[in-house]
Amino acid sequence: MDGLVPGIVQDARTGEVLMLGFLNATSYAKTRETGFVTFWSRTRQKLWMKGETSGNRLRVISAATDCDNDALLFRVEVEGDGLVCHEGTVSCFTKPIAIPSQRQGPVVGDPGVRAEVNRG
């Protein structure tokens, strides 16, 4: 991904996923330095501190990597009015899509369904 890693932003209080952006080494260092999520804008080719203009900055409460160390999760507190998306919504994930169900019977995680582990 040309030195970019996806950064998922989640509300630390509610757990809601707010947005996805990309970070490079410079934006990651800036995030660590300031305590506010800073992305690399792929369209503008420059650093982008989310909320710097609107006042809805993303204060990092905690951060983690995924199991492959190729994605970041930021749990944040949103400053300002809390509207993270440029479309004026709390989350950027507001456009539902229909996906036909592929389920055939019970699935692990459903109530009463447990995974069986073969330790043989």
Question: Language-model segments: which ranges?
Answer:
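C-terminal binding/interaction regions
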Residues: M1-L4, A12-R13, V17-L18, L23-G120
